[in-house]
């Protein structure tokens, strides 16, 4: 994080300490449990090492809302990632390893509550959109006066699971050309072979990009980044 900020990155997307449910729960979810004090320590370590103060965006949108609300009240991050479509992820990018799977509905009443709480606390929402239904939900919150423009969204391409959007230039162009007024977008690509091509398209179109160990731990196919 520190080297990225000192090299010019403006937003740090943080994953503080957390654990994932070992199995699908009775309510159909498989989500994350957060170590709230650990998040504060990670943020402070970043502040201490940076020459300029970055925007801190708390991730792990697959955390449960009551605990994430507690996290926001306790620490007031600049931004928080909020999944605006159902979580249905299948991290099976390494052959031979058991995939990590996540499930959560994130219905509109929950999204409305996210918008109310973040508005009261002065925390900016990042609306995660794994497919275009997430944009529709964000528009819905904007029309109801619960989200304030500009709405900041992230398009996720190549993230496997039931909310998958293919990592192609055509998909990137579709997202760009259907962007509603009052929206700004960021792009994340989880595909080692296609990442740099799609991010280049996003930049040319005037969008923003997200890179790092979560999105793609490879510098090129089969070559892991060292940190």
Residues of each region from the PLM?
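Alpha-helix-loop-beta-strand connector modules within alpha/beta enzyme cores
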Residues: 23-58, 113-118, 173-182
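Catalytic alpha/beta core domains of metabolic enzymes, predominantly
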Residues: 79-214
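A structural motif
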Residues: 6-9, 77, 206-207
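A generic, well-ordered mixed alpha/beta core segment in the N-terminal half of proteins
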Residues: 39-86
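C-terminal functional modules
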Residues: 225-227
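Glycine-rich, proline-tolerant flexible connector loops at the mouths of alpha/beta enzymes
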Residues: 10-39, 156-159, 216-221
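Non-catalytic positions within long, well-ordered alpha-helices that form the structural scaffold/packing
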Residues: 5-6, 73, 119, 203
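Short, acidic/polar
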Residues: 1-3, 64-72, 195-199
């Amino acid at each position: 994080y520190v080297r990225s900020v000192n090299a010019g990155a403006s937003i740090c997307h943080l994953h503080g300490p957390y654990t994932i449910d070992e199995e699908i729960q009775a309510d159909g979810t498989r989500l994350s449990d957060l170590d709230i004090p650990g998040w504060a320590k990670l943020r402070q370590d970043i502040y201490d090492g940076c020459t300029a103060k970055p925007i801190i965006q708390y991730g792990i949108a697959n955390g449960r809302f009551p605990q994430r609300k507690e996290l926001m009240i306790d620490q007031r991050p600049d931004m928080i990632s909020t999944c605006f479509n159902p979580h249905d992820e299948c991290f099976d990018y390494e052959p031979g390893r058991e995939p990590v799977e996540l499930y959560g509905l994130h219905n509109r009443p929950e999204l409305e509550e996210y918008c109310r709480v973040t508005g009261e606390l002065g925390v900016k929402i990042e609306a995660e959109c794994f497919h275009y239904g997430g944009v529709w939900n964000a528009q819905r919150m904007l029309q109801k006066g619960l989200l304030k423009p500009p709405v900041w969204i992230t398009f996720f391409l190549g993230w496997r699971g039931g909310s998958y959007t293919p990592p192609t230039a055509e998909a990137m162009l579709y997202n760009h050309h259907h962007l509603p007024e009052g929206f700004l977008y960021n792009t994340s690509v989880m595909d080692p072979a296609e990442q740099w091509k799609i991010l280049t398209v996003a930049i040319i179109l005037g969008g923003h990009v997200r890179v790092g160990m979560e999105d793609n731990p490879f510098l090129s196919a089969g070559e892991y980044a060292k940190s």
